[in-house]
């Protein structure tokens, strides 16, 4: 079927839903014939996909030549005028004219001159009326996104019989109009082509990328399939465009079909295609398939490595990510600052301080000056590994600081409980003329909440509105509720919730529920829990917290009711998980697990010695944290199997004497483990840094930085 008939049968652009289903069926059959597995049901991640210009520049803009070459003085008028000497300019190659920057002329003025010149020469044969000349001028219009000039050039091309049948010019016109957000004009150029031989792969690709560029990936994919129906062999660029559309649509089925076409191709597949295919599988959560594509690539550039590392970082597959980074170094791949900026947040998430320091060493060894985002990530990594002093060192040596730099440093102090440093840095920030924003005040207010600085926190909330003109957002009200609730001012916290200009979120009710846990307020806690069960019916943390409130009040029947409610709703308590980095490996421990380690002779020896030492210091298990109706001995054994205790014992065995122990946990630390950690830090003379979901706990010589307030 001819392409014109295909499109006319569809009607208005954008009404392609039915045809898209046909596309999926067609490509799916093709993939099955090629032996590429197709699944009808795939669990997709909700993460949106943004294409990086550095990954696939062809998918966003056609590469543009530089416009910054200075015009030779010989081609200006002898009197020094800024106008162009047309007689002399007709003698120079066209490319040197279009991509030349006459002294004192803006790019807009330069395009005006160029278009005027080519309009004047269009009526007579000259070296300015060639396809090459128009191609270069269209390049300039695309670069400047100049629709006004583009329409003039389009008119000249379409009225010139020797130019309007040039596929390269057609593709450039389509690109120009799509870049200028005029898909209607791009589509008209495409549809008005009556000679199918002019619809080359580049023209089809230009139309497809036009749709993709303007947020219509489904239409881009339909153009690609129509091209196949017209017996046009897709090239690497067209395949890249189609795969990008699959990524945007999260359509793995069609993507696998295109993968099948790639497998059958005899031509060499370039890295751009593989990079997009890699992204498709990674964004679909199919990391094993993505790794197969990666391992099967004959050539891999830094973009390819960065793509895989980035997704592994986002999905918290940290061990694989670290191994890939080391392999990248072994293969002498020159990583960019973007690589390190991607890895550092992963180090932050699992408190991988050793790997973070390794990256810092790479930065120091490099001759290239690190950019601000990289230093911000480095600062954040140290803060979230509990090394706030190193964060401050990085902050102090930064020659250029943006607002994010100040906010990160404030947050590093806040999460580590250094409220005095938070206040001092904030005052310095104001004196330096840096205007705070909403993120600044989240760090400040959360720091006040964690350290019990109630009055200062309340005054800061007012200053935010009156002095700094920052309108409080929902997260600021959540901090305010937390500040009041933790101080025992439950009624005031409830009043804030009732009068604030936002509908209370789960974080608001969660803050209130935690305050009720701290102060044993059952009645208000039940109100908060009721709201949370509606907003987050499958969040086990809410059920556990209200169970703790009932358990502390010895209301065991209510504890049983909560447990039964969880069973009926299919809610399971999230398993406690802790991890530590020892040497270059991340060790993960799950509550009640680690049987092989717990049955080892080294564990039994250290654990026995440790328990004897802490019992002599007066420790006895607080079994109230166990909400099951079992005997006290069983409860004590369960508490001893909590993941942070396993991680601590492992670190005592496998690290040198005096080396700080750093643990990250996926849940809030329980009261008994908190007491246990304090005594362990005292009897072993070790600094223990535990980061739970709420804050940092620095245990030093039997004292915690949170002052038992968390």
Curated annotation (Swiss-Prot):
Residues 584-615 are annotated as: Type E(+) motif. Gene3D superfamilies: Tetratricopeptide repeat domain. The keyword RNA-binding does not apply. GO terms for cellular component: chloroplast. Residues 616-710 are annotated as: Type DYW motif. The keyword Repeat applies. One of its GO terms (biological process) is cytidine to uridine editing. Keywords: Repeat. InterPro entries: DYW_dom, E_motif, Pentatricopeptide_rpt, PPR_At4g14850-like_plant, TPR-like_helical_dom_sf. Residues 508-583 are annotated as: Type E motif. One of its GO terms (molecular function) is zinc ion binding. PPR repeats lie at residues 166-196, 200-234, 235-269, 270-304, 305-331, 336-370, 371-401, 402-436, 437-467, 473-503. Disulfide bonds: none annotated. Belongs to the PPR family. PCMP-H subfamily. This is Pentatricopeptide repeat-containing protein At3g14330.
